[in-house]
């Protein structure tokens, strides 16, 4: 720590060092020279000396006032019963006074006095002795006054005792005299006592009277007594304030009391009167009950039998009298005076006085059974809360919902637990639960059935042509574009037995159809073209067959074409885990030609051989079960479904349940369009009579009761609808913030109408795959059947393009579409529809901007024109320099500025462009910082159409 000398301190104070040294000597700080060190204590002593010499002294506060204010809120019901918040403000003010005793003050003053010289010291000593003498005299006076006061108090006590003794003696004498003369002498004795008392008291008190003290001592005693009284009053007020503050704190911190009404005790019957309804007579010595509870007034017409039973009877007379005087009515709920309502009986049953307290109801915990889907309103009703509370809680959980929105079971159960209730998975009253037991027939014997074979492979590999040769028909020629777009089901009678074939599409769009075909089949024939080998849909067919765990027979087709490489096909199939039997695998390879018929018999033999190994059996004399292969809406026949019977026998007139649809079989056709009365296992047929178009891939079964079928179908449709809505809403909410972040996204709304369910499903899936981050395909509606006016109206509202796949619009729909400029597109080949939609989406993409360099120029000189500004005299080194083109200014191969060329001049003429090898003057727009040697790159921005 730095040491401060006297000279340095004087420099800080801007005073001469000699004057500071003299002041230090006066303050009692012994410093010989200006080089001596000063401590903090020396500076404090100097400061105290200067303050006392200037008369300021220590500026200590003798009185401190503290003010404290606290605000609290209490809730209290007003006259109308509503809770009101009242603000309570508590203010506390305390004053602290510092009291110094006179002797201590004198000692401090004496100690703090500086030593100046001997004469002054002598004078101060004399003053101190005088002060001490004065204090001694004051103490003696106070002691003398205290002794006089004590003597006076002693004399008063003795006089009081003497008076009490005299009074006691007089009372004793009066009692003795009263025994002989009871009336008259008593007055005389009393008078004697009164007369004797004044004589006795002065006799006793006279000797105790002390001599009067001096006036000075009396004044000092009065001052001391007054100070003591003030101190006592101050202490009393302080204690009262502290008690009040502590009481308020205790009241605010105390827990709120819940008033619980006591259950009234039933009066116990008196002993000896049990079993009787008569009022017992009061005993003669017993006091009256009315006297114990307060005598009843003559005006009271009813007496209170028991205070515990009722307290209202006692008030009846008072209420009636108040009503007669115009006061409160007896039926006004106990309210009288200004609290009673003015007008008639209306409002007389409102709440009582604000002092009425209702105990809060205890929270009720409910057991909520949550189904698979439930609306917000229904869930709120089950928990006995308002729907708004449920919506608030869902918002806290991050779900934006409406009152009619469907919630899935998991979300609803989490919400119920969050709101303090118990959630249970509801046991649904599901009609499907016992459906299998109703339909199952166990006492019917199993019989052999024909195998169901699915033909799969890549597009144009000859699947349908292979079936054509087997069926000796020309089915492939009838398909649009020569490709299969429907799943076909045929059964063929061969010399070796019956076989049912399912022909699936090979186009990539029909993945779901191929999966359904693999699900319904017993065997899979994988057709591979010898010239193409394994293709993407070939690999997919292999995966479907393995997923369905069905045997695979490979038919290598088109072996009659020149240039085929069978070994390459084998190696590619082995790479896909399809190993031929020749190499130790389990898949027979057959070389066939659908054109010449080569290998067809061998292929059928392999199919029947595999079927014998599988030992395929099914019940015949039982209700039919099977699979919906394809479904469509026919204009004349209504909903039509192609079904494959897997077990039992389907007859005309049976009640069929297929997914969420049902109906009675009105007509049944085979694959050739001929009517049929029944169909056994492994037979595909076309049925009519369903209420709606079923979903392809749904299972169907025959029920004995149409009412039960309708009930199950209705339940399934409602359940599917609720689940679909909940999933749609969840998808919307999840994608909402993503869509907001992406900005504006182009959408292409479409309405798809197809001839069959499978084609509509495949077309919709293919078009949805075309969606990109900038252009999205939105399928507004997709259904089976012709294009109707309702479809056109939906397209008008949603600004959608209508796509008809193998269907057409009726006359009314065409007229409405022409009048409202609705785009109608018809297709019969699926990849034509996909290509056109893809080109339409390409046109909706924003064009891509690319820079094209058109020329360069070198700045040779820089000159300033008065009206134009800074002009760059340049030489065009390559390409052309064009007016209004964009440029980049390079200085030492570093881009300095990028902008636009304002004008180009050649020989004082304003020109549009200057070619290579010519000099020109270039004026740059809004830029003048150019130097000799800079390079200009001139370019144009061109828009290039983008493709998907």
From Swiss-Prot:
UniProt-annotated stretches for the region G1: 457-464
Biased composition (Basic and acidic residues): 262-271, 298-308
Positions of region (Disordered): 256-362
Main location: cytoplasm
Region entry G4, spans: 557-560
Region (G2): 482-486
Low complexity compositional bias, start-end: 282-297
Subcellular location, record wording: Cytoplasm
Family to which this protein belongs: Belongs to the TRAFAC class translation factor GTPase superfamily. Classic translation factor GTPase family. IF-2 subfamily.
NCBIfam families: IF-2, small_GTP
Protein name: Translation initiation factor IF-2
Species this protein is from: Methylibium petroleiphilum (strain ATCC BAA-1232 / LMG 22953 / PM1)
Gene name in the database record: infB
């Amino acid at each position: 720590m730095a040491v401060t000398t006297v000279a340095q301190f004087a420099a800080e104070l801007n005073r001469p060092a000699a004057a500071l040294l003299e002041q230090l000597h006066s303050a009692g700080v012994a410093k010989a020279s200006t080089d001596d060190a000063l401590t903090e204590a020396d500076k404090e002593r100097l400061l105290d000396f200067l303050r006392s010499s200037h008369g300021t002294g220590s500026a200590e506060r003798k009185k401190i006032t503290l003010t404290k204010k606290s605000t609290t809120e209490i809730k209290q019901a007003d006259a109308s019963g509503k809770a009101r918040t009242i603000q309570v403000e508590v203010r506390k003010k305390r004053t602290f006074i510092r009291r110094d005793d006179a002797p201590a003050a004198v000692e401090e003053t004496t100690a703090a006095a500086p030593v100046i010289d001997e004469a002054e010291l002598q004078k101060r000593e004399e003053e101190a002795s005088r002060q001490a003498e004065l204090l001694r005299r004051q103490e003696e006076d106070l002691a003398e006054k205290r002794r006089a006061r004590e003597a006076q108090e002693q004399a008063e006590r003795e006089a009081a005792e003497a008076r009490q003794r005299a009074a006691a003696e007089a009372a004793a004498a009066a009692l003795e005299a009263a025994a002989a003369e009871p009336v008259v002498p008593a007055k005389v004795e009393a008078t004697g006592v009164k007369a004797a008392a004044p004589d006795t008291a002065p006799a006793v008190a006279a000797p105790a009277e002390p001599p009067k003290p001096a006036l000075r001592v009396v004044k000092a005693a009065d001052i001391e007594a007054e100070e003591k009284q003030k101190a006592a009053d101050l202490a009393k007020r302080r204690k009262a304030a502290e008690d009040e503050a502590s009481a308020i704190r205790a009241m605010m911190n105390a827990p709120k009391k819940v008033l619980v009404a006591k259950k009234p005790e039933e009066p116990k019957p008196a002993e000896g009167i049990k079993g009787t309804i008569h009022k017992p007579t009061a005993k003669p010595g017993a006091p009256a009950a009315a006297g114990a509870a307060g005598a009843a007034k003559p005006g009271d017409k009813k007496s209170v039998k028991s205070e515990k039973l009722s307290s209202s009877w006692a008030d009846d007379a008072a209420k009636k009298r108040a009503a007669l005087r115009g006061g409160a009515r007896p039926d006004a709920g106990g309210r009288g005076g200004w609290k009673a309502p003015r007008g008639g009986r209306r409002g007389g049953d409102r709440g009582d006085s604000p002092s009425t307290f209702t105990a809060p109801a205890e929270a009720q915990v409910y057991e909520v059974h949550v189904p698979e889907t439930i609306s917000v309103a229904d869930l709120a009703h089950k928990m006995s809360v308002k729907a708004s509370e449920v919506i608030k809680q869902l918002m806290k959980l991050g779900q934006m919902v409406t009152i009619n929105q469907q919630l899935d079971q998991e979300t609803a159960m989490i919400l119920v637990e969050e709101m303090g209730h118990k959630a249970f998975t509801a046991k649904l009253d599901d009609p499907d639960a016992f459906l299998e037991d109703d339909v199952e027939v166990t006492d019917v014997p199993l019989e052999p059935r024909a195998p169901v074979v699915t033909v799969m492979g890549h597009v144009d590999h000859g699947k349908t042509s292979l079936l054509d040769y087997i069926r000796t028909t020309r089915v492939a020629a009838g398909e649009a574009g020569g490709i299969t777009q429907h799943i076909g089901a045929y059964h063929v009678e061969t010399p070796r037995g019956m076989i049912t074939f399912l022909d699936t599409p090979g186009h990539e769009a029909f993945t779901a159809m191929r999966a359904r075909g693999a699900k319904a089949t017993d065997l899979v024939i994988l057709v591979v073209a010898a010239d193409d080998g394994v293709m993407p849909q070939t690999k997919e067919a292999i995966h479907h067959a393995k997923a369905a765990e069905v045997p695979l027979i490979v038919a290598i087709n088109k072996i009659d074409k020149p240039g085929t490489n069978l070994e390459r096909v084998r190696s590619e199939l082995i790479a896909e885990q399809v190993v031929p039997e020749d190499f130790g695998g389990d898949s027979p390879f057959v070389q066939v030609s659908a054109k010449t018929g080569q290998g067809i018999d061998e292929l059928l033999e392999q199919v029947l051989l595999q079927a014998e190994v599988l030992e395929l059996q099914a019940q015949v004399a039982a209700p039919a079960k099977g699979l919906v292969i394809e479904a469509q809406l026919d204009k004349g026949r209504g909903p039509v479904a192609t079904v494959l019977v897997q077990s039992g026998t389907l007859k005309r007139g049976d009640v069929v349940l297929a997914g969420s649809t049902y109906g009675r079989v009105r007509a049944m056709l085979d694959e050739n369009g001929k009517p049929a009365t029944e169909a056994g296992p492994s037979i595909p047929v076309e049925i009519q009579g369903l209420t709606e178009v079923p979903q392809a891939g749904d299972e169907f079964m025959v029920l004995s009761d149409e009412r039960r079928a309708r009930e199950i179908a209705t339940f399934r449709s409602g359940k599917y609808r609720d689940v679909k809505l909940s999933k749609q809403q969840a998808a919307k909410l999840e994608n909402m913030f993503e869509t907001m972040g992406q900005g504006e996204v182009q959408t292409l709304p479409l309405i798809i109408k197809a001839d069959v369910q499978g084609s509509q499903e495949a077309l919709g899936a293919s078009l949805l795959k075309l969606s990109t981050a900038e252009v999205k395909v939105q399928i507004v509606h997709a259904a089976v059947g012709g294009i109707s006016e309702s479809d056109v109206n939906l397209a008008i509202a949603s600004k959608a393009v209508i796509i008809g796949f193998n269907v057409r619009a009726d006359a009314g729909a065409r007229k409405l579409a022409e009048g409202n400029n609705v785009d109608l597109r018809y297709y019969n080949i699926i990849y034509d529809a996909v290509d056109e939609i893809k080109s339409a989406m390409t046109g909706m993409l924003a064009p891509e901007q690319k820079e094209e360099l058109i020329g360069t120029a070198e700045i040779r000189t820089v000159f300033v024109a008065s009206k134009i500004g800074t002009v760059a005299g340049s030489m065009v080194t390559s390409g052309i320099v064009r007016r209004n083109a964009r440029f980049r200014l390079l200085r030492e191969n570093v881009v300095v500025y990028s902008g636009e060329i304002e004008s180009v001049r050649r020989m004082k003429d304003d020109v549009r462009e200057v070619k290579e090898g010519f000099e020109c003057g270039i004026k740059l727009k809004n830029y003048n910082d150019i130097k000799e040697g800079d390079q200009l790159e001139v370019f144009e921005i061109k828009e290039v159409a983008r493709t998907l």
